[in-house]
Structures are given as structure tokens and as C-alpha cells.
Amino acid sequence: MGTEEPQPPFFLGIDLGGTQIKAGVVDDRGRKVHAIDPIPTEVPRGPEVGLDNLARAGRLAVEQSGLKWEDIAGVGLGSPGTMDIRAGLLLDPVNLQGWNNLPIRQRLSERLGQSVVFQNDANAAAYGEYWVGAGRDVRSLVMFTLGTGIGCGIIDEGRIVEGRHSHGAECGHIIIQMDGGRTCSCGMTGHLEAYASATALVKRAAEAIEGSPGSVLAEIHAQGKLSSKAIDQAAEAGDALATRLMDETARYLAVGAATLMHTIDPDLILFGGGMIAAGAKFLDAIRSYIPRYAFPIPARETRVEFAGLGEDAGFIGAAGCARIAHRVSFSHPDR
């Protein structure tokens, strides 16, 4: 945060994940005051334990920040899964088995004694980047979060795109193969996530190894250590199969990016999540394929970059959503 004093009011952001919970306090300018070490979500123990953990994470973040609970002007929660954002309901979250039809906003609010602003986790991360991250100089952006799946958030003219049914930015489920496509984590086929997520990359590699026994990936797979990171490292070392797999992944993501250029026409497309550790070469590959699939003007004019806030994007964005609700109304966000 530098030498400047934190600027009140303060906001608490909580980022719920399938394995862990991140939480932090930010000031009115989006500067991080404090973030806790992530704590386990403990999904198998059920939603009541999970809700207790969410509340504990939030209170811990405030306590460790040196602030009092009374100093917190708003609380934001970002969550994965299918949801009804306006109703504050988790519907059928794949990564939170057993948390179906959970009124998570109300239940967390009861535990904290304060109202909670609820948002899709990818939307929250995108808003964090728009507010104080890599997108702070634009009015519209799309952010793909590449990890176990592919999350996506859209900010259009400063507003989070939720859609009528809270499915307004499920861009990981763009269809790129109509018939005979790979099965996605959602159970449907042909979705971008089934081809370009970290999980999909590992699956594609495991299948390809059978036809390339001489690849270094075959040995890594035999040791049970095949991962997206290992595939990227093998590509960097010059392994032909790994190079092809990473290049194919870049091409799939370029298709996704071009689709958003033709529908949202944003100023900026960001890629975040664990897979961006692949670095500049991977990003350049995505950029190089975009002109094949996008009209010339958006292909040329739309910036394509890596996200800037790293793992903090989720809770910073969730806190930013709480700030919106505190300052004006959620339908008219600003910086």
C-alpha cells in the first residue's frame, strides 16, 4: 500500500472457493489493508460448517487488519457455481457439492450481523481488475479465469453483466464443438472449458501420450505428476507434444476471445488464474490466433493482457461490489 494512510470507509471481501476461502479488507480506493492466509472451506462437512468458515474468515480479516467491525461499511461475497444473484441463492454449485438451493447471502449475513452483497466469483474478480487492476483505465472488459474450470466476468460500460438469470458471463461454456465434443464439468459437451481449462489440458495430454510414447510427458504421466504446469515446463524445454498441446490451448482461448469481441466488443480482454504462469509466450500465442477468428478492427484494437491482481482479485472485487452498494446502488457501479 505504500506510505499513504488507508482511506476510509473500509470494505470486507470474501472469496469462496471449492477448497479454500480467501478474505481481505480494502479501503475506499481499493488498496489492500490486510488479507488472511486462506482457510479450508471444508465442503464435505456441509454448508453449515462452510458458512461458519466464511464468517470466521471475514472476522479474522477484520481483526488482523487492526480495524474494528464497526469500521466495516460493507461486506461482499464472491462464490462459484450456478446461482440466483438477486435472490442470494446458490442453486447447484459443482464445486460445492451438497450446498444446493442455499440462501447463502442471508445465512452469512445472519452470522456476521451485517448485510452481504452477493456476486459470482468470476464477476467479482473481473470487477476487481476493472476497479484497481489491469483494467482500471478502460470502460469495458472481459476476464477469463483459467484454472480447474474457466470462469468469466464481464464489465460493460462500468457495469457487471449478470444477465436475466445470473448466467450473463458464463463464457467458459461457449460452445466450440457442436457434435461429439468433449464433456464439460457441467455435464454438457463441446464447451470451451472442456478444451482449454487446466483440467482439460491435462486430460488432452493424457490421451495424446498414448500416441507419443517418446514424449517427456509420458514419463511425467507415469510418475503421476502430470499437470498443466508440468506440460508448460515441458513445452518450454522443447518437447514437441507439450508444445502442440499448449499451442492448441492458445487457439481454443483465441476462439473464446474472438467470440466475446463479436458480442461484447470490449476495450480489454484479460486472462487470469493459475494457467497464466505459462507466461508471455502463451499470451502471445493467444494473440497470434485471434486475427483468424475475429473481425479486423476488434482483432487489431482490442487489448489482450494478463490480469494484474493475482489471487487477490476475488476478494478485492467482492469488496468493491460492497462499496458500490454502499455508495450508490449495485446497478450503477463506479470506480
Give the residues covered by each predicted segment.
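Short, intrinsically disordered, charge-biased short linear motifs at domain edges
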Residues: 168-176
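A short acidic Gly-Thr/Ser loop motif
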Residues: 14-19, 145-149, 167
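Adenylate-forming
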Residues: 125-131, 151-154, 173-174
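General beta-strand structural signal in soluble alpha/beta enzymes
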Residues: 116-120, 154
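ATP-binding/phosphotransfer module of carbohydrate and carboxylate kinases, centering on a glycine-rich
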Residues: 1-74, 84-89, 106-114, 128-138, ...
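Short beta-strand scaffold segments in enzyme catalytic cores
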Residues: 21-25, 150-155
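A charged helix-plus-loop insertion that forms the helical arch/lid used to bind
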Residues: 88-98
